[in-house]
Amino acid sequence: MNPGYTKYIPFQPQKIEGRTWPDHVITKAPVWCSVDLRDGNQALVDPMNLQEKLEYFHTLIDIGVKEIEIGFPSASETEYEICRELIEGGHIPDDVTIQVLVQAREHLIKKTFEAIKGAKNVILHFYNSTSTLQRKVVFHMDMEGITKIATDAADLIYEMSQPMIQEGMNLRFEYSPESFMGTEMDYAVDICQAVLEHLHATPENKVILNLPTTVENCMPNQFADMLEYFCRKLPSRDCAIISLHPHNDRGCGVATAEMGLLAGAERVEATLFGNGERTGNVDMVTLAMNMWTQGVDPELDFSNINKIKDMYERCTKMPVGDRQPYAGKLVFTAFSGSHQDAINKGTQYMKESGSDFWEIPYLPIDPADVGREYEPIIRINSQSGKGGAAYIMEHNFGFDLPKAMHPEFGHIVQVETDAVGKEITPERINELFHQEYVDVKEPYKLLKHAFQESVDNEGHSHVTFWGTLQHTDTIFKVSGEGNGPIDAFFNAIKGEKMARFSFLDYSSHAITDGSDSQGVAYILLKDQRDGKEYWGVGLSHNINLAPLRAILSAINRAKRE
């Protein structure tokens, strides 16, 4: 066995007594802050240009995001110019706050204040690294030295902010102890409390304390313990808004955010579809729609997810995965036969019950809620079952196959998928249905027919059938009587070497509406010689002709064997 795992130091959980967060429930949306234009953009192979950033920015506004981190204006001239364009170009609605990021360094802070001049609502977000590893490996400083970096920056920011605030700018502050996950909790409390004091935070003018999982290095429940401990110990908790900034290195970004909200956080910084450094930031779409499925309004609009996804892929040049929650191409698709059958039954239940609640197995959300369609839900491959093909025929083409017919047609479709070794389209399934049941015109074909109905003295109906049939090259006439058109036709053909078939089942329905409506009939016959059963299907605009064609379809299928 590879012993490489021995070089890693296990995460040491924060000890906490009487934790309460597991008993909490998310009942309202957090404050959302998009960091797509900073964290997301810096992680792209080809960062967005100005026009792409503007398109992305306006999409975030349409979604309903009220706090948007637009960049790091002191980092480069490009970032600075984008900030100025957003402000001077009138792109920022009055109810939207832009957020700018800056390191806790004097010259960068001063440049940032130049960049935000003229803006109405601004969050100035500054940070420095506080973790044990960063102090030891990067900064070679003790806790006191790291704290001084943060408080010196806080003093400068507070001083420079006062003239802008007096001129009418709604300027708020945010501080991040970067690498919070790797910081001793008591020290994290101390440095954040010091920053709150130097920024003169009050319950009326709260400071955002953003506690990032800069690199995700523990389980989500362990992070929640840390967060609850931090909130308990922070002296000026009422002067702070606790914000989360999860990354996804362990694949637990969404869980970390959700448990963090349970533990006391009120705000989340996230990106669309989880774009960001390494494995990405927490996905705003997944987090918001998870709340939606629990009956909580996320206060974000993802009702046209495909439009949002198209914008994202165009601007970032990054694909959204087929299995991406809520947005991927295949997330509302079922290949498994048992899943298809359950979805079909759930759909029928919803129609019949008129329930106000979403109760369809294997679909945690109504696809229509994100602007998706029902049609592609069930897909057919070699793993699909009897119900899937029938579902496709009903929902794509209007054929409501009798339940007893599902296994037979499902097997026909499965033979095809096994042969081609891949998924087959609804159109191909429809072709197979017609080839097997509808377009079966040999050896028997009905050329002409007529009915005459009479009523006896007791009010009983009697129907007489006359018709011309063709059997290979032979044309012959038949006639028969019965208590209805189907019975009369069946009696008429019994004398033509078809007496061995007995009638078992019949159903019909319309598949189109209006004066030009078309009907379909399903007939099940039994061959008395060997007991085998055969389904037949007939289509016609004539309500009396469809079942006759279905009977001949069943007989022709029997003769074909």
Where are these regions (language model features)?
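A mid-to-C-terminal "edge-of-domain" accessory segment
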Residues: 1-36, 295-479, 515-518
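N-terminal capping/small domains of soluble enzymes
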Residues: 1-108, 372, 377-380, 384, ...
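Alpha/beta enzyme core
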Residues: 2-8, 32, 48-67, 83-89, ...
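Short, small-residue-enriched loops and turns at beta-alpha junctions
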Residues: 39, 43, 73-77, 131-133, ...
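Catalytic alpha/beta core domains of metabolic enzymes, predominantly
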Residues: 218-352
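Positively charged, aromatic-enriched nucleic acid-contacting surfaces
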Residues: 463-469, 511-535
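Mixed-charge, glycine-accented linear interaction segment located at domain edges/termini
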Residues: 531-561
